[in-house]
Amino acid sequence: MAQHVNLQLGDKVADFACGTGGFLKSAYDVLAKQTNDGKVSDLQVLNSSFYGVEKKPLPYLLSVTNLLLHRIEQPHIVNGNSLSKNVDDYTDKDKFSVILMNPPYGGSELDIIQKNFPSNLRSAETADLFMTLIMYRLAYNGRAAVVIPDGLLFGGGNKRAIKERLLQRFNLHTILRLPTSVFAPYTSIATNVLFFDRLSKEEEQANKGWSTKQTWFYRMDMPQGYKNFSKTKPLLLEHMKDLEAWWNNREEIIVDGFPKAKAFTPDELKQLDFNFAQCGFPTVEEEILPPDELIAQYQAKRQEQEAIVDKALANILALINAKE
């Protein structure tokens, strides 16, 4: 994700649910390569580039430790709830040029937290609120990459309002559909990555329609030979080669009659009632045979297996008799 948000030295990078600081560390790895041979001013800029918030005490401590170990001498990590402030109270100084996040999903928030958001964007679901928070805290010309669950893609109600606002106010240029097991063994929830940018102040003020011109959807299929990812068989960089090749040379891809990559305009997505669950994973339908065909198949298979067993027994008996 950090490689696809055009990180530049001087960017202010934020993660409002930073966990152990993995995304901030990834951003550091990208920006550290842009420093000039240990130039003091570059290192000072680099050290002041990262901001994180973590609600839980243990991950908070681990995130601070993680950044310290990677030579970020003054980690700007806060132990708290990013959702506890009214989004209308944020000013330009509270906004960031890059936001990288994998917000918690499956959780729910109290009414007092939900009231910090506009009524049409309110939700008890934590991931929805973080998605709205990101839209309020991304600076002009800012870039964001956010992991979100499938529920937001096809959901209606407040989820629909969030998606419509995203297309109206931001350039939602890419949605990456991830395999279900990509975060195994930590979660089996199907996830996606949304990549979007905010326009410049001048462009935003002049814009009268959709800020998004088109949104590309790309389905990342399982590598050949893999049924799923796991702790012992994790997602590796080499598995991303097809995605990397496509990213800079985008074109529609059809596999076995199903779209793997395809672009949609905001008007087309509106006609689909803002259903972002496009270029999904094909489902293999199992053919259910009539009972007589199933019985016939079973009997044929049974006879085949019995013949194999009979042949093996005959060979064993022949060996025994030969020794006698």
Which residues fall in each region the model found?
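A conserved structural/catalytic subdomain of Rossmann-like adenosyl-cofactor enzymes
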Residues: 79, 85, 91-324
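Conserved S-adenosyl-L-methionine
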Residues: 2-101, 106-108, 124, 128, ...
